[in-house]
Amino acid sequence: MDPLGPAKPQWLWRRCLAGLLFQLLVAVCFFSYLRVSRDDATGSPRPGLMAVEPVTGAPNGSRCQDSMATPAHPTLLILLWTWPFNTPVALPRCSEMVPGAADCNITADSNVYPQADAVIVHHWDIMYNPSANLPPPTRPQGQRWIWFSMESPSNCRHLEALDGYFNLTMSYRSDSDIFTPYGWLQPWSGQPVHPPLNLSAKTELVAWAVSNWGPNSARVRYYQSLQAHLKVDVYGRSHKPLPQGTMMETLSRYKFYLAFENSLHPDYITEKLWRNALEAWAVPVVLGPSRSNYERFLPPDAFIHVDDFQSPKDLARYLQELDKDHARYLSYFRWRETLRPRSFSWALDFCKACWKLQQESRYQTVRSIAAWFT
């Protein structure tokens, strides 16, 4: 007579099953949360985030905190083993170079070597006798050595003597650990920083400033063929004087500048383009790496490459055509509507090393500078 009697055990069984399923769901959520938290703490950074870790094993507590530092950005002590080319340079705070950036204590006082978190070694200043000019071989625990050069492989001697000494590379090469190009283009918008190009002030055609002549070099041989068809004003040693104080004023009178590199290597695009040509508002005529290499750093219509012409005579004819066609000549300046050139400074390069060291604590050894750089 009791219709509910047989249904009671079934109701209890369903209730137990629901409880077990709920506990299982809670467990799955908990372990999923635990794994995500663990991955965020020790794994690769998620897209859009930067993993910032303190340098482990830094010597003698040199990561002291100051008013600009935070736990994520320790204030490191960086030693310049020599001034670049033995010439002292100003060392402003890195936060002054890039507002809001972290700071390091950067010094050329070799007495701080035992406390330094990192040592920057400028290759040119040690290359003639590396064994005698390098820092002491017994380095403090965790100290990182940075190999630094803005010269091309053709002008870097005794690279093989540096095997196993360094932890990071720093150069104009884009595949360096710390990339320090001679120049770059910075996007901008709004009113032009410079007044529009005054074409009437461009009273001369082609200039070239060269300090190391090298009669057998590719650039001198090309110039000698070019000047047979086109007048080129040459400045520098054994040529017209070009005082540093009036250099930009002089070069800005020219429509074109021969930005010919002293040696041909990937990414080796120097101040000859970034300062001598672009800062003078002259169209650079380049001889260096390939056009495609230049186009990694410049719009294709910002320069003229010698490889675009079958001969120096053809290049001369093209420059003479542009001299008479103002519209075509001015087309080489359109990129300046949205971009502006910037040139390197030693201080900014040292700050780039500071920021790299703060962001990456990984300790590595560069087995062979020579194998990588040449």
Swiss-Prot record:
E.C. no: 2.4.1.152, 2.4.1.65
Domain of life from the UniProt record: Eukaryota
Cytoplasm found in the keyword field: no
Locations listed in the record: Golgi apparatus, Golgi stack membrane
InterPro entries: Glyco_tran_10_C, Glyco_tran_10_N, Glyco_trans_10, GT10-like_C_sf
Job description of the protein: Catalyzes preferentially the transfer of L-fucose, from a guanosine diphosphate-beta-L-fucose, to the N-acetyl-beta-D-glucosamine (GlcNAc) of an N-acetyllactosamine unit (type 2 chain) of an oligosaccharide, or a glycoprotein- and a glycolipid-linked N-acetyllactosamine unit via an alpha (1,3) linkage and participates in the surface expression of VIM-2, Lewis X/SSEA-1 and sialyl Lewis X antigens. Preferentially transfers fucose to the GlcNAc of an internal N-acetyllactosamine unit of a poly-N-acetyllactosamine chain acceptor substrate.
UniProt-recorded name of the protein: 4-galactosyl-N-acetylglucosaminide 3-alpha-L-fucosyltransferase FUT5
